[in-house]
Amino acid sequence: MANVTVTFTITEFCLHTGISEEELNEIVGLGVVEPREIQETTWVFDDHAAIVVQRAVRLRHELALDWPGIAVALTLMDDIAHLKQENRLLRQRLSRFVAHP
């Protein structure tokens, strides 16, 4: 099964996510997303970056956060997701050694 990755130019990315080029420059500078490729004169973004930016835009509208606040919130949300996954895996490993009533 082949993986397909959709890529966007800056203009396509901004149209797809609803952000301006200035906002895109700011969130790239904050590390919210990174270009998949840096071509000679432009950036190219993948579909994962579009999902992250759409999530960021939702946070901006729902919580009225600025872009630096959104960068922190997304980092914390990702950390929580990783910790939950690690906790789930550790519980599964522990359950092998603990007798269930």
Curated annotation (Swiss-Prot):
Superkingdom: Bacteria
Pfam families per UniProt: MerR_2
Cited Gene3D superfamilies: 1.10.1660.10
GO molecular function: enzyme inhibitor activity
Family matches, as InterPro entries: CbpM (IPR022835)
Induction: In late stationary phase.
HAMAP family (alphabetical): CbpM
NCBIfam families: PRK10265.1 (NF007617)
Family that this chain belongs to: Belongs to the CbpM family.
Job description of the protein: Interacts with CbpA and inhibits both the DnaJ-like co-chaperone activity and the DNA binding activity of CbpA. Together with CbpA, modulates the activity of the DnaK chaperone system. Does not inhibit the co-chaperone activity of DnaJ.
Name of the featured protein: Chaperone modulatory protein CbpM
Organism, as annotated: Escherichia coli (strain K12)
